[in-house]
Structures are given as C-alpha cells and as structure tokens.
A protein has these predicted regions:
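N-terminal lobe of the biotin/lipoate ligase/transferase fold
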Residues: 1-99, 127, 252-253
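Long, positively charged amphipathic alpha-helical accessory segments at protein N-termini or as interdomain linkers
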Residues: 8, 14, 74-76, 80, ...
Length: 253
C-alpha cells in the first residue's frame, strides 16, 4: 500500500518497495485526472530499477527513486526540451545541499558532482492503451546515502540530513518553474541556462550512435534541443540521442 498525498497541483504516491517506479506509475495512469498537473511515484527501494539503455540501477534503501508522469505541453517536435527542463530542475533541487563541491549537468541526463555521477534521469514517452492518452514518464535516481564505485552520494559532500522527499518536493517546484518558462517564453532561456551549467562542454567529445562514433566539439543546441557537434571537417551534426564521451573517456561496450 502507498501513502498518497497532494503536493502543488499533483499527487505523490509513496511506497516502501516496488519492482521499479517506472513500472508502478503505469498502473496508476488510469486514475490520472485531466485537471492534475502530474502524478509522482516515490519508493524507498526498487527491486529491478533501471537506467538508460536498460542498465541496472542499484537501488538500496536511503537513496531517491521516483518517476513523474505528466501530459507534456507544447508541440511534439519540442518534446526533447523536457530533458533540459528535468536537468535544470534536478540541478536546482540538489544545488542548495552541495555548497562545497562542483555540480554540473552532463548531456543528456546526468548530474555530476566533483566529476562523478550523483543522479540520472530516464525519460520515456508512454501510450496508455486504456485511456488512449500519451504521457511523458520521467524516472529519476539520486545517490543520497550510498553510491556504486566511481559514483558519488550527497552524504559524501557533507549533505547528511537530506531526505528523499526533500529533493522530490524541490524538484517538482523547480520543474513547474522551468516548464512555465518554456510555455511562456520558448526555448532560449532553458537552453542557455543548461549550457551555462553543462559539464566539460569545452572539450573534444565523441558521441556513440549504435556502431557509429562521431568526433568533434560542442557547438550548442538547435531550437528543438538537438545537440550540435562541430566535426573536424567543418560540418555540423545534430544529435538527438546517444552516449557522450569526453577526451579519452572509456566507451561502454
């Protein structure tokens, strides 16, 4: 059973344990009323948490595991902007607790602290066959009290009293701010702010797209949020998805 309570213009469902928050929230979409701004599932632990590309997300008790469901605003070709909105909101939620360390956003979906990963975001567009509606599902994991090897947690940078719900509520408030900015002012402020918080954007980069490796330098974003890579021959490539590597960073697989 979940503890259910309202927050802002949505509802938070808090569970002790679920298979994954991404799977659990799909069972609740039939009760997601049109007048609600969001639906959120928060769990103390996950049995089968996952990250991007199906990677396992280790999920011990004490860290943050959540998924937010919403009806995305704006035109479909701009839906990729939600990756930046989520990144900015999570940065804003974590920054007050990280006063003696460097925090930055790694494209497309990670929060880095002292050059190590503290948090990750998994976005999924989901069609609910029962209601016929399309939803954006935003899965999120934050290392609060423990982290795998070569990762970092909040308690490793002096933030010992942070509770998962503190971050959830701060994230949802910041998300509403950035989504309103997008709806009212367009994409420019979101993309420029994200770029100002970006991690290692002045370095040589490689993007892995399946079996293809693209090498170049960061060249900004287009209006839809696609990453622009400046190739060595002077051409530009627009990237909407892929794994980004810096310098001699070892590639997965």
């Amino acid at each position: 059973m979940a503890e259910v309570f309202p927050f802002l213009n949505g509802t938070i469902h808090h569970y002790q344990s679920v298979t994954s928050t991404q799977d659990q929230i799909k069972t609740l979409l039939g009760d997601f009323a049109p007048e609600q701004g969001f639906l959120c599932v928060l769990a103390d632990a996950q049995q089968t948490g996952r990250g991007r590309h199906g990677r396992e997300w280790i999920s011990p008790v004490g860290n943050l595991y959540m998924t937010v469901a919403l009806r995305p605003k704006g035109q479909r070709q701009y839906l990729g902007l939600y990756a930046y909105i989520c990144g900015l909101a999570l940065y804003d939620a974590l920054k007050p607790h990280i006063t003696a360390a460097d925090i930055a956003l790694k494209w497309p979906n990670d929060v880095m602290v002292n050059d190590q990963k503290m948090a990750g975001i998994l976005m999924e567009f989901h069609h609910d066959t029962e209601s016929g509606e399309d939803f954006l599902l935003i899965g999120m994991g934050v290392n609060i009290i423990s982290a795998p090897e070569e990762r970092i947690a909040l308690n490793m940078v002096g933030a010992d009293a942070v509770k998962p719900l503190d971050i959830v509520e701060a994230f949802l408030g910041a998300f509403e701010h950035w989504q309103s900015s997008y709806v009212e002012q367009g994409t420019a402020d979101i993309l420029s702010t994200w770029q100002g918080r970006g991690w290692r954007l002045d370095e040589q980069v490689q993007v892995k797209l399946g079996s293809e490796i693209i090498k170049g330098r960061f060249g900004g974003f287009d209006e839809f949020g696609s990453l622009i890579i400046l190739l060595e021959n002077g051409e530009k490539r627009r990237i909407t998805a892929g794994q980004l590597y810096f310098g001699n960073e070892k590639m997965d697989g």
